[in-house]
Amino acid sequence: MKIELENVKPAEIEKRSFEIITEELGDTHLIPGTEPIVKRCIHTSADFDYAKNLMFSEGAVEKALDAIRNGAVIVTDTQMGKAGINKRKLAEYGSEVLCFMSDEDVAETAKKNGTTRAVASMEKAATLDKKIIFAIGNAPTALVRLYELIQDGKLTPELIIGVHVGFVNVVQSKELILSLKDTPYIVARGRKGGSNIAACICNALLYML
């Protein structure tokens, strides 16, 4: 079989990928300031639906960038999400990525309360005396608990990235966050998402600084 391959130098592969994305987006309207995030999600997934299903609260990107500049930590709901975030870039702003899912006390709390580790890890994060960006790519229960903590006045996130993937309570939990009036969010409406998408949104924000 003879297949014609595009001749691209290794250092230019990512650049060429973004050129293709821009070409294929054509006249698709993107909210001003969100283009780098949308394009990086498409680059990560090869899924152009993100041009339509990524929802941004007003000023979310600017607020997130300010939070990172001021040392906000990023809390993820998976080790995979944590692994995918550019920690060296984040460290330039005196910050770090945290994931409590494997912590022994989180496992004990989840077992004691008959809930998920994701719920317990969000509760642990809420006790931090820090500015927090939440990057949720896997667990709907994490997002539901964040919503409850916000409604109870126990948590004020700098940003919630709600891009978890799946079928059970995924759509519903995202809609809860979309209903919040005073919490900045970036949410992938519908079933699509994943820890890789959560990480790439964090990286897109970091690369915008």
Residue spans for each PLM region:
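Charged, compositionally biased N-terminal leader segments and the immediate start
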Residues: M1-P32
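Buried hydrophobic positions in well-ordered alpha/beta secondary-structure cores of metabolic enzymes
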Residues: D77, I160-G162, I201
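A short, well-structured juxtamembrane/interface segment
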Residues: K52-A67
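Conserved mixed alpha/beta catalytic, RNA-binding, or beta-rich assembly cores of soluble enzyme
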Residues: T78-D152, P157-E158, G166, K174
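Short, basic, glycine/proline-bearing loop/turn elements
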Residues: T44-K52, A107-T109
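N-terminal glycine-rich anion-binding loops that anchor highly charged ligand groups
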Residues: H29-H43
